[in-house]
């Protein structure tokens, strides 16, 4: 059965891409074929090959198949287009068709979101509405920093309110000098309604590294046998 996961974060720049990379590498090392999917990528740059986004390129680099960029990132928005003040319709059918196409080709598709759970697209709708439509199980990335406990609990509650399961969370140490790191992890472990499936240490250029060893797929249990959550 095909399996898809949606990666959300407690905020922007908390490490969704490196955690997506880690999850893809962990699944691949277990003999599964994988693909990363960045439905909407903000802050993309013009290149001779067209609009490209650095996060989507990371996902493309660890996908099992040689896929065209557009298969990984169907909507690439420039810096100007990324502003919610820039009204721009989002073709959600295009996003769904792209996800379905990837799901037909590989065992696992890791779908990376944009910003946090309620981050708005240019049509002033959160991407989470599309995630609900697709009925994708959710993994949350918590950037361990001041205030992250509040952000993590609010995100978990929002996911639950939208009727989707939070199947796990990953701690990403984005601030190596943060005091009380262990205490924060302990509190989150007690308060979040999902298992901790990995801890990523602070690593320079993490997006270029092998990260699969930091993910404990066994903590996901039977979830790996689920394609989508049935309504």
Swiss-Prot record:
Residue sites binding Mg(2+) per the record: 17, 55, 112
Protein name as annotated: ATP-dependent dethiobiotin synthetase BioD 2
Role summary: Catalyzes a mechanistically unusual reaction, the ATP-dependent insertion of CO2 between the N7 and N8 nitrogen atoms of 7,8-diaminopelargonic acid (DAPA, also called 7,8-diammoniononanoate) to form a ureido ring.
Cellular compartment(s): Cytoplasm
Family matches, as InterPro entries: DTB_synth_BioD, P-loop_NTPase
Organism whose genome encodes this protein: Salmonella typhi
Homology family: Belongs to the dethiobiotin synthetase family.
GO MF term set: ATP binding; dethiobiotin synthase activity; magnesium ion binding
């Amino acid at each position: 059965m095909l399996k898809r996961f949606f990666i959300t974060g407690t905020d922007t720049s908390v490490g969704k891409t490196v955690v997506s990379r880690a999850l893809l590498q962990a699944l691949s090392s277990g003999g599964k074929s994988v693909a990363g999917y960045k439905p909407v990528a903000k802050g993309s740059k013009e290149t001779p090959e067209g609009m490209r986004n650095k996060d989507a390129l990371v996902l493309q680099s660890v996908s099992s198949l040689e896929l065209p960029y557009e298969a990984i990132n169907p909507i690439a928005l420039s810096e100007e287009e990324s502003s919610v003040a820039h009204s721009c319709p989002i073709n959600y059918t295009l996003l769904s068709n792209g996800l379905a196409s990837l799901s037909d080709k590989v065992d696992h598709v890791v779908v990376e979101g944009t910003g946090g759970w309620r981050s708005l697209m240019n049509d002033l709708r959160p991407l989470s509405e599309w995630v609900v439509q697709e009925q994708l199980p959710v993994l949350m990335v918590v950037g361990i920093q001041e205030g992250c406990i509040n952000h993590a609990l609010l995100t978990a509650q929002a996911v639950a309110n939208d009727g989707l399961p939070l199947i796990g969370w990953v701690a990403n140490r984005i601030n190596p000098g943060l005091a009380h790191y262990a205490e924060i992890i302990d509190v989150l472990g007690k308060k979040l309604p999902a298992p901790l499936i990995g801890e990523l240490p602070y690593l320079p250029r993490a997006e270029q590294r092998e990260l699969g060893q930091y993910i404990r797929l066994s903590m996901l249990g039977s979830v790996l046998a689920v394609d989508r959550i049935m309504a």
